[in-house]
Amino acid sequence: MNQNTSTRRHFLQSTGALVATTAITPYYFSAERTLAQESKSANDRPHIGQIGCGGQGNGITNAARQFGDVVAVCDVDREHAERAKARQGRGKAETFDDYRKLLDRKDIDVVTIGTPDHWHTKIAIEAMRAGKDIYCEKPLTLTIDEGKLICRVAKETKRVFQVGTQQRSDGPFARAVALCREGRLGKITRIVAAIGGGDRGGPFKKQEPPPHLNWERWLGQTPLVEYIPQRCHAQFRWWFEYSGGKMTDWGAHHVDIAHWAVGADNTSPVSFEGTAEFPVPFSNGYPTVDNAYNTATRFEIKTKFADGVELVITDAMGKHFETNIPETTLDRGNGLLIYGEKSDLFVNRDRRRLAGKAVEEERDNPLPEGAIARLRKGARRGHMEDFFDCVKTRREPVSDVFSHHRAITTCHLANICIRLGRAIKWDPEKEQIVGDEEANRWQKREQRKGYEITV
């Protein structure tokens, strides 16, 4: 198991203690049983269908089954599906290798989607059309135009849709955003999001797919290629064909918080420029090697919002990012460093760390009552608990599909910028790259026949 997957799964499954630096119980999944205990009757519990039964798919469904009953599981890897049937459905869940058959079941109320990234949008759109509420793993989309489609269908169907950007349900991150929104740092001038670099690997040997894996179906909308074990399951994120590398994997988290901090849930930066290193050679934006990881390993992209706020997305904060926060408190490899005219603030997931002058001053000058609750739209404390409360009440979840689309668009644009090796301009109103026809074509991808995304 790679460190990224292990850390994330621990974050999802934690039922943790109080956070010493904040004296607040973490929001994410710590208090999940509260709502679950309210549903005393088995008839009150929603029926859940699990689509994607790998490590992360099981992680989110583990949390979901506190509030509902898993009645069906689906995966194109038969071994994954059988393990999920035993684990999630106590051996009673119906097993599928085609998600469409699961969606045909009228008794399923909720689906969890924990597939590789290139399947998220197609499954989510068809699930909404089938009348299901959705909890989908991040990043929600493979391209910018996929995000436009998924937002369109979400508006039309009015289904409850929670994205797995659970840092919005984590106390220190919500508190950091509240401090920014309440002006405790002064005017925000710059945010640096350090998200870690991608993996290197390859060349890998092409093989026959194992008999328990439907490789052709796993590939979905992407080109039909020979099987390499390192292309699929947890390693899919290091291939641009199926994901966006660390830019979308961890950018989905930290860039989302950056957007939230500056009130940019309905927009994206207007300019992008930067540099990157890749593990294989590129030509015209495409990798020239087909048997090795190809997403960026090191990068620094400077973006700017229309109001002048700068957002830097980097694999690690170099020393050129100076701050008044002590080095002993910083983690330059992962976290958000937020610069304000009055002071700086740092927050990350490691030990739920939150530091800066504004944090210290809050002890004598607390945030206004309800500041965090208003920011979180009245959400329940746990991320999954919030989702199931929204299923019950029909309100909008804290990590809604529309704000996520804007944040992940920023990540997609950063990847387009470094793959083409040039600066790009973005019109957030028209949702279109400006003055660059070639770059504009990268807002979508050709989809393999039989696996097209239709609305």
Region locations from a protein language model:
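N-terminal Rossmann-like NAD(P) cofactor-binding module of classical short-chain dehydrogenase/reductase
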Residues: 111-112
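NAD(P)-dependent dehydrogenases' Rossmann-like dinucleotide-binding region
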Residues: 52, 184-202, 214-228, 269-280, ...
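N-terminal Rossmann-like dinucleotide-binding module
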Residues: 18-89, 167-170, 258
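N-terminal secretory signal peptides and thylakoid transit peptides that target proteins
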Residues: 1-19
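Beta-strand-loop-alpha-helix segment that lines the small-molecule cofactor/substrate pocket
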Residues: 116-117, 121-169, 183
